[in-house]
Amino acid sequence: PDVSSAASDVYKRQDIKLLFGCDTGVGNIYKDIGNKYGPIDLTFINIGAYNFYPIMPYKDKSVYHTNPEEALEVAKNLKSKKVIGMHWGTFVLSLEPIMEPPVRFKAGAEKYGFKKDDAIIYKIGEFGSLKKLLDYN
């Protein structure tokens, strides 16, 4: 597939590293990024819009969107300390139940080495503070 329109970016400010994974699938590149730039303090990654079967039977999952467990795997490969699941529940792009991604994301956190509080889901419309999340002044 043409991945030129998909993007993930690492942002660094002082000693803080953030990764914003936008419209991304799973790949070995994240181990490479983790080895080169890790540990990442906070990763933002998509967890929704991944189930396209049976409307596209030749494509049983999205190559552009991780499911919740794949998102946790990516964050683990990045050596992320914390991970925020995003890109879910806004509007229907695929066939998984619209509220399934955050439930699966939180349920799978410990399996991928994250404390439940370090796999973060915001309610629709909720916002948070990077200072609070990263414990810096």
Question: Which residues does each predicted region cover?
Answer:
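Generic enzyme active-site microenvironment
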Residues: 21
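A short acidic, often aromatic-flanked loop/helix-cap motif at beta-alpha or helix-coil junctions
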Residues: 124-131
